[in-house]
Amino acid sequence: MSRIEELQQEAIELLQGLINTPSLSSEEDQTAALIKKWLEKHGVSCKQQRNNVYAINKHEDPSKPYLLLNSHHDTVLPNSGYSRDPYKAAIEDGKLYGLG
């Protein structure tokens, strides 16, 4: 398996973990912990404030411009028409399905 394939598999596993973890708005402490643990495992310095996780590039150079990547990790309550288990990441035909 190439390094790119390894990283792709790790990204899929992280996404599956996030999908499998309920994270309704204001209740995303478990997904915040999952993200922080993943970053720390990969040697990325990070801080957590409430459910927000802040990470700094380990190759940070103060003489260069900064780039902010921002995302949310909360979800809305699944509606009654949802046809799958919303908290079970499923891969079918090369596609990943789940709430999020």
Residue map of PLM features:
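Acidic/His- and Gly-rich active-site-bordering loop/insert found
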Residues: 2-99
